[in-house]
């Protein structure tokens, strides 16, 4: 059985963690902002941030992005982008492939197609 579990990040309205078999997504309002995944069996973590993030607005989004990433502030996040620790991709294009080779849309479709699946939604809006 494959599960997708959705919860509010630290109980915050409009800030969501989406747990999937492929990894963990952070969604703010209606946009995917970040993804953390693991490379196969060696558990090497990789992180993608959406390349359309507006760094100058939505202070709540930036606050919860830092919490999701474990960064102290946005300056630290920007430094990790600069040094290659985080990669920028278009997470909100449903066909964008993540490192594991699947898009967010494909992950959800695959789970829905399986004979037994369970999704728990707490206010999540899929595009």
Predicted regions: what is each one?
Residues 1-127:
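Terminal leader/tail segments of proteins
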């Amino acid at each position: 059985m494959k599960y997708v579990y959705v919860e509010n990040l630290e109980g915050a309205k409009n800030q969501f963690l989406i747990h999937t078999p492929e990894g963990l997504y952070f969604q703010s309002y209606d946009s995917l902002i970040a993804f953390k995944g693991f490379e196969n069996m060696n558990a090497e973590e990789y992180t993608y941030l959406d390349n359309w993030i507006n760094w100058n607005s939505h202070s709540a989004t930036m606050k919860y992005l830092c919490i999701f990433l474990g960064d102290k502030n946005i300056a630290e996040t920007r430094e990790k982008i600069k040094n290659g620790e985080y990669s920028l991709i278009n997470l909100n294009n449903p066909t964008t492939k993540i490192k594991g080779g699947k898009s967010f849309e494909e992950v959800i479709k695959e789970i829905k197609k399986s004979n037994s699946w369970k999704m728990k939604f707490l206010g999540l809006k899929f595009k």
